[in-house]
Amino acid sequence: MSSKFLILLAFCGATLVAAEQLPEKFYGTFDLDHSENFDEYLTAKGYGWFTRKLVTFATFKKVFAKNANKNLFDYSNLTSKKDVFYKNVQIGSKFEGEGLDNTKHEVTFTLKDGHLFEHHKPLEEGESKEETYEYYFDGDFLIQKMSFNNIEGRRFYKRLP
């Protein structure tokens, strides 16, 4: 029985060591600078005119903050309408969090080829739909890319000092 315990302990230890970490370049505060094709993206998702205008004219900041545990990070989505905070996020681990629409979502952050993906699956009825946001850098901008039915929208964020 003790050998099984040691094998399990070794496996768990290897899993913790192998946990993916958020790349250093993502840490910081980013302010929305401009968008491309965002209203078209929201229209494709079926959002009404009023909701689209509220989202389009809202201010947005993204904050990726370091955590005491190097395998975790804190994420904030700060808007003029509502702020959302996710604490102790681990790459690849699902967690339940509140979305900007005030409903519960199953949220997962993953990494692939230097890009960060934020996947939301609504857990309650409402206007919100399942979606994945892709974050990557192009020059000075953190770009948030989203698509639905071949309609792609992009939001461009500038790093704040």
Curated annotation (Swiss-Prot):
Residues in the signal sequence: 1-19
Protein name: Fatty acid-binding protein homolog 2
InterPro entries documented for this protein: Calycin, Fatty_acid-bd, Lbp1-4
Predominant cellular place of this UniProt entry's protein: secreted
Recorded name of the encoding gene: lbp-2
The entry's keywords: Lipid-binding, Secreted, Signal, Transport
Entry's family note: Belongs to the calycin superfamily. Fatty-acid binding protein (FABP) family.
Transmembrane segments: none
